[in-house]
């Protein structure tokens, strides 16, 4: 039996304006102070951001002064396309981008004398961690507990160790703090990982010193926090970005981590729209912090709108799911 040929067809983007309900329209027309938009899946939070961006562009605002932050490169690309399809204005910068893309662009805005930044890939970082672990094995396993000795030889352990460093960094926890927490909680693995983390950071510094290309290699776990530090150390650059991005919008804020929220706090002005749904966070595995969502939203609750109309799911199904989560 012959197989039927198939092709992957990209979803056709809609160029027509969305029909907004009264709650959505209130968000789109809001100006002058931060606004928090809450709503479940299918209530049109992302639609609100697209329409709010387009409304400002149609009023004459420079598209390059609007920054729409989201999670995932594919989602950012979809948002850029949805907006570009309905405006003829030229955009010199990506209007929608991820926090990591924004952070890297900030680090590329170097102060005088700063080296060119290069972002290490995940596989590069894991490979380097494996090299250091191999050295630990040759040195008699250093601080590693005996029940982890066999694990040190595996790729999976290097991957888990990298993930621990990522998650800790996103929460503003450094190696010293991790060691302290390990001692307080009686977590011997944390203490061993903290000691390794210090060796890892020291070896990264030595690599930078011995590198021939005079470029700054950035650990992915430090990317967003380094961008915040860079802005604090360069107040003129911070003022430049705050003046450039007069409107900031954030989609899926529940997927953010503490480092990303800190960067947003530095950049945000008065024209700020944040969309969130605490019930649908799916990124805990990569550092999302939905448990801290309410506290993170508090500084921006000058006005709050809850979207109640569901356009993508049956209302009964949505209600059952929401009640179950509650």
Task: Give the predicted meaning of each segment.
Residues 62-65, 92-93, 269-271, 277-278, ...:
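Short glycine-/polar-rich loops that comprise or flank the Walker A/P-loop
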Residues 112-198, 304, 310:
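ATP-hydrolysis module of ASCE/P-loop NTPase motor domains
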Residues 123, 293-305:
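Conserved P-loop NTPase motor "coupling/switch" region that bridges the ATPase
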Residues 8-41, 95, 125, 186-294, ...:
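Conserved helicase NTPase motor core
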Residues 48-56, 68-71, 75, 79-83, ...:
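Structural preference for long, well-ordered alpha-helical segments in enzyme cores
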Residues 1-115, 119, 239, 319-322:
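P-loop NTPase Walker
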Residues 71-76, 153, 309-315:
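Acidic, metal-coordinating catalytic cores used for nucleic-acid/nucleotide bond scission
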């Amino acid at each position: 039996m012959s197989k039927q040929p198939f092709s992957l067809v990209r979803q056709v983007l809609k160029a027509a304006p969305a029909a907004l309900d009264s709650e959505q329209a209130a968000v789109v027309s809001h100006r002058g102070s931060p606004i928090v938009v809450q709503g479940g899946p299918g209530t049109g939070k992302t639609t609100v951001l697209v329409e709010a961006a387009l409304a400002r562009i149609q009023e004459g605002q420079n598209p390059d002064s609007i920054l729409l932050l989201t999670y995932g490169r594919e989602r950012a690309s979809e948002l850029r396309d949805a907006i570009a399809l309905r405006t003829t204005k030229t955009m010199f910068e990506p209007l929608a981008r991820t926090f990591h893309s924004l952070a890297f662009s900030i680090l590329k805005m170097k102060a005088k004398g700063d080296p060119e930044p290069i972002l290490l890939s995940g596989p590069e970082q894991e490979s380097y961690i494996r090299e250091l672990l191999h050295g630990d094995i040759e040195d008699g396993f250093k601080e590693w507990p005996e029940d982890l000795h066999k694990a040190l030889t595996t790729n999976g352990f290097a991957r888990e160790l990298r993930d621990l460093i990522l998650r800790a960094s996103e929460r503003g926890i450094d190696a010293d703090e991790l060691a302290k927490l390990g001692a307080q909680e009686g977590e011997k693995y944390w203490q061993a990982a903290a000691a390794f983390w210090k060796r890892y950071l020291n070896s990264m510094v030595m690599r930078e010193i011995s590198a021939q290309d005079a470029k700054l290699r950035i650990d992915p776990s430090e990317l967003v926090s380094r961008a915040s530090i860079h802005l604090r150390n360069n107040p003129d650059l911070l003022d430049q970005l705050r003046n450039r991005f007069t409107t900031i919008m954030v989609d899926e804020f529940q997927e953010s981590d503490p480092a990303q929220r800190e960067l947003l706090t530095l950049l945000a002005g008065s024209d700020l729209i944040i969309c969130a749904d605490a019930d649908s966070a799916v990124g805990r595995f990569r550092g999302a912090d939905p448990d801290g969502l309410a506290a993170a939203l508090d500084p921006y609750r000058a006005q709050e709108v809850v979207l109640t109309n569901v356009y993508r799911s049956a209302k009964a199904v949505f209600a059952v799911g929401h009640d179950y989560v509650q």
